[in-house]
Amino acid sequence: MKNDNRIIKNTIKQFKEKLCKDFSQKANITSITRKLAVFIDTILIQLFIKNKLHFGDNFCLLALGSYGRRELQLHSDIDLLILHTEKVSNIQLQRAQKFIQDCWDVGLEVSHQITTVSSCANLASQDLSVISTIMDMFLLCGHGALMEELIYQTHTLHMWPSHQYFFAKLQEQQNRYAKYGETAYNLEPNIKNGPGGLRDLQILLSISKRHFKIKKLAEGIGYGFITDKEYEELKYCQNFLWRVRFALHMLAGKPEERLSFDYQVKLAQFFGYQDQSHILAIEQFMKDYFKVIKRNRELNEMLLQWFNETIVYHQKQKIIRLDDEFQLSNRFIEVRNNRVFKQNPQSILKLFYWLVKRPDIEGVRASTIRLIRESLFLMGKRFRESKETANIFINIFRTGNDPYDALQRMNRYGVLAHYLDCFATATGQMQYDLFHAYTVDQHTLFVIRNISRFKKNEYAKQFPLCAKIITALEKPEILYLGALFHDIAKGRGGDHSELGAIEAQQFTQRHYMEAEDSKLIVWLVRYHLLMSQTAQRKDIYDPKTIEQFCQLLPHARYLDYLYLLTVADICGTNPTLWNAWKDSLLKELYHAAKTRLHKQQELLDEAALISIRKQYAMDILISDGISSRVIQDLWSQFKGKYFLHESPEVIARHTKAILNSKQFPVVIIMPHHSQGGTEVFIYMPHKDERFTITTSVLSNHHVTIQEAAIITCDNQFDLDTYIILDENNQAFLNEQRARDIQKNLCDHLANTGRLPAVSRRRLSRALTHFNVKTQINFIDDNTNHQTQLFLVTNDRPGLLATISRVFLTLNIHLHNAKIATAGERVEDMFYISNQTGYSLNHEEKTILKEKLILEISKSKY
């Protein structure tokens, strides 16, 4: 008996191998899934007969779910229902259990239920998933009358009337979207359960079956539920997703449903995508994938809405006229007749203008969505060059209301891509990294959504400065249009900011915008990264940095637009990207630039600035009862750079801590003055190893360094400041943890023995799939006798500790560091000098570069 099962198991293995070979040779996926279902039928029937369950009228074997629909994927579960009469004996039930055991023994992943018709019907009346799978049942073997009785007992006359079933399935989909629509699932989408995935197709078939009593979705054409073209589109989406899913199962060797990063690479290779100069094979594959799920989701939304309007609420219409072309039906906008778009194609855009102008409109009627999709061909060259069209499109952004929902719909219905060729190119474009969580088109719309949120009271507490600025903004439409074009050229190769600026220039000319408005929009697109790069890579406390930044702003008002776009852009790139530290950096840069641009502060020389900050700090300390002479004696040992970098409040706090200290090192952990991070302040006799010790200890405590300022005083004491964040990129809240770090730093900095070992930590699963080539560039800063080292590499635990050890080995002195992490990519800036205090020469740079690359490659664990 066991030998028979072994033979069957081997037969199944060989058959699946043959199917995989056929699939690899581009066999039709529908044929393959059906062949597999039919083959499994023969195995199950054979085992059913072997266990003598086919005699008489006591048992019935049914295939359910995708297996019942004859759509079996390579490693999908095989859903079975064994119905039996009330009078079966225990021996017969044991045979049924033995049948299931045989299924498992031959390697079939079987999910099963052994029950009576009445029990099954009772369960179906209470469980949505049960009634849904029953609707797909297919008779394999046994007494068919049992199946017919189950069909009768689960009919809409007895349970789950179509409207109740519809709303339950709709809620189920909303719950699924909430679960699988998160960022992680966007980077590594679930092909079965994710938004736009196969479940979105199955719900359309389910509600059609329940209401129209049809067996296939194609039969819904005759009921007006779906058009021929829409059916063909859905069929295309289904076949694409089936092919990807079959290949995923084949490559994984198991029922894998998630397109994780490693499988994305393998799938792109399997389907024949090849890297191009400006776009990776994986990005091409995922672009096609995202386009398909976007189309699938769009059709799902439209057809479910059609069902709701036509079947559920068909007798409850309240009509309100808007104009000659549009009206509201139960708060949903619709055309007043089906010739509107043909007679006046500009009305396609006008509909979306109404959506922005009237925020009380809840959506677009399904019949009108269908008409929009059928009318997209009218949006040709003549349409796009029309001045009337241009005015309507610009007015969408000029109403003063939130345009996000209207633009989101324009994107879903294909209107934006038909109106803007450059947007069509960007649609579905994904970047293969952990930094960008969304496709370019979705990210763009999220940035626009974020701008609109700055105006809303519920976001004023989270973004107070943005809320203040945007209320005084003269022309918000400029900001919206800058956002629309800021990433429009991603995926083409070259500098997307420059290419996007060209697109923006052409757009503003075609839309008859005023010269000054056009100039600002183009500038925003070209320089949309300026503020974030300045804040994260440069010393924003240095007046020269502020002066250089301001010189790139043609007018003071440009700063307001740029700040708002920068915040909206960061928040719309990845939900984990924005934190209090980035917030504080951008605010400080904004305020410093604002002061300089409005001439409230003339460009002072360093000596004057130092004098002002010293005086403010002195006033604070004297008010605390500290002698001015004691303060001046201490300050006389500090470098001028320290007073430029720190605010008067921080200078006073550091000074007080040093003067109150009874021993060295002085280590203080406290909130940074901006409250965006946690500050680690260290004052101690000079020690070359201190940077290495500090980075090693902090790495072992799983904190990340955002900034470091390293200063050796004239009295040969070191005065170092670090800004750190916890694992969640937030300032520390745990006082005990801060005390533990403080104690460890004190112990190791005071110790003259070995350097602290850096604890080894594994890379996260996601990080292991990315390989950022280590790049090192040097720029000499002759004014300060320093060399700027710009490092790009893979993020990994303990990276900064590794770098610090290289600096120590080669006698490289660090003066300042700016640390920036974007997903798997680290972009760090170090201001360094050699052991004599000067910029590195060519030989020193070469040795440092080679040593860093070697040690970084060894530290990837």
UniProtKB/Swiss-Prot annotation:
<dbReference type="InterPro" id="IPR005105">
    <property type="entry name" value="GlnD_Uridyltrans_N"/>
</dbReference>
<dbReference type="InterPro" id="IPR043519">
    <property type="entry name" value="NT_sf"/>
</dbReference>
<dbReference type="InterPro" id="IPR010043">
    <property type="entry name" value="UTase/UR"/>
</dbReference>
<dbReference type="GO" id="GO:0008773">
    <property type="term" value="F:[protein-PII] uridylyltransferase activity"/>
</dbReference>
<dbReference type="InterPro" id="IPR013546">
    <property type="entry name" value="PII_UdlTrfase/GS_AdlTrfase"/>
</dbReference>
<comment type="similarity">
    <text>Belongs to the GlnD family.</text>
</comment>
<dbReference type="InterPro" id="IPR045865">
    <property type="entry name" value="ACT-like_dom_sf"/>
</dbReference>
<keyword id="KW-0511">Multifunctional enzyme</keyword>
<feature type="domain" description="ACT 1">
    <location>
        <begin position="679"/>
        <end position="760"/>
    </location>
</feature>
<feature type="region of interest" description="Uridylyl-removing">
    <location>
        <begin position="322"/>
        <end position="678"/>
    </location>
</feature>
<keyword id="KW-0808">Transferase</keyword>
<keyword id="KW-0378">Hydrolase</keyword>
<feature type="domain" description="ACT 2">
    <location>
        <begin position="788"/>
        <end position="861"/>
    </location>
</feature>
<feature type="region of interest" description="Uridylyltransferase">
    <location>
        <begin position="1"/>
        <end position="321"/>
    </location>
</feature>
<dbReference type="Pfam" id="PF01966">
    <property type="entry name" value="HD"/>
</dbReference>
<comment type="function">
    <text>Modifies, by uridylylation and deuridylylation, the PII regulatory proteins (GlnB and homologs), in response to the nitrogen status of the cell that GlnD senses through the glutamine level. Under low glutamine levels, catalyzes the conversion of the PII proteins and UTP to PII-UMP and PPi, while under higher glutamine levels, GlnD hydrolyzes PII-UMP to PII and UMP (deuridylylation). Thus, controls uridylylation state and activity of the PII proteins, and plays an important role in the regulation of nitrogen assimilation and metabolism.</text>
</comment>
<keyword id="KW-0460">Magnesium</keyword>
<keyword id="KW-0548">Nucleotidyltransferase</keyword>
<dbReference type="GO" id="GO:0008081">
    <property type="term" value="F:phosphoric diester hydrolase activity"/>
</dbReference>
<protein>
    <recommendedName>
        <fullName>Bifunctional uridylyltransferase/uridylyl-removing enzyme</fullName>
        <ecNumber>2.7.7.59</ecNumber>
        <ecNumber>3.1.4.-</ecNumber>
    </recommendedName>
</protein>
<dbReference type="GO" id="GO:0006808">
    <property type="term" value="P:regulation of nitrogen utilization"/>
</dbReference>
<dbReference type="InterPro" id="IPR006674">
    <property type="entry name" value="HD_domain"/>
</dbReference>
<dbReference type="Pfam" id="PF08335">
    <property type="entry name" value="GlnD_UR_UTase"/>
</dbReference>
<dbReference type="Pfam" id="PF03445">
    <property type="entry name" value="DUF294"/>
</dbReference>
<dbReference type="InterPro" id="IPR003607">
    <property type="entry name" value="HD/PDEase_dom"/>
</dbReference>
<feature type="domain" description="HD">
    <location>
        <begin position="440"/>
        <end position="562"/>
    </location>
</feature>
<keyword id="KW-0677">Repeat</keyword>
<dbReference type="InterPro" id="IPR002912">
    <property type="entry name" value="ACT_dom"/>
</dbReference>
